[in-house]
């Protein structure tokens, strides 16, 4: 008799901004422009980091990984979100939703871990420059980057399997732009406290641990910078560190707000909370990937020279 109250869902309806056509049009234009900037900025960085031999260093290897990751991260959700803004039928299959959840969580976890690895790389380069070639050899930095991807994939696979095994009732309306794992969990007609606890533990491990490494690394870097006698020599590294910390705090902070609040206790003002989650989505899914190329590399002298060299070579070939 218990199964009579349940139906096997084959698709979900993504509510997004349904009922607000003007907002949908505004968000479509805004997110589309940001997505194009993300593709151009990160694509350029990947291209020059491969083609320019001077950029074949651990730092640019990590930056290339970050750029590729940001393109993948946004592509898992942004195109489908843009289509849903213009379409009256805003549905996604159960299997498509599971794939979207897996890719989204995998990319998010990978980026958190990779940002921690990149902070450690900069700490060694600035605070221990003589030992840098030994510590950050190819045998070290390639496994570091690969490990970030593996951690993200494993964590996401575990989380996604736990969610798709939940029983879902007749309510198939996801109050979000995409299949965010928490938004999908809300639809389960079962106790999700166990899922929330596992998500809390993994988020703490893969978000706060890299964040702690980032804070410690940049604190030591800043202390090392202040030992430089020349104020001119301090200004550029200081501004670079502050800019990078801003991006990291924006990315990690929004994910912290998204995944570490007790969702099972959200009974009052749920509409306001869902609106907040949608706003957070814009920040950590679009803003951070758009800012990363500018903050981490496109202001860098070596990168600017590499871009100029690439353009000159292209014009010469013509």
From Swiss-Prot:
Gene Ontology CC, one term: plasma membrane
Record membrane topology: Multi-pass membrane protein
Residue intervals annotated with topology Extracellular: 1-25, 76-99, 161-197, 259-277
Chain ranges passing through the membrane: 26-46, 55-75, 100-120, 140-160, 198-217, 238-258, 278-298
Ranges facing Cytoplasmic side: 47-54, 121-139, 218-237, 299-318
Tagged with keyword Lyase: no
Record: glycosylation sites: 5
The entry's keywords: Cell membrane, Disulfide bond, G-protein coupled receptor, Glycoprotein, Membrane, Olfaction, Receptor, Sensory transduction, Transducer, Transmembrane, Transmembrane helix
CDD domains membership: 7tmA_OR13-like (cd15430)
Pfam families named among the record's database cross-references: 7tm_4
Highest taxon of the lineage: Eukaryota
Cystine connections: 97-189
Location in or out of the cell: Cell membrane
Entry similarity comment: Belongs to the G-protein coupled receptor 1 family.
Function description: Odorant receptor.
Protein name: Olfactory receptor 13C5
Organism this protein belongs to: Homo sapiens
Organism lineage: Eukaryota, Metazoa, Chordata, Craniata, Vertebrata
Gene: OR13C5
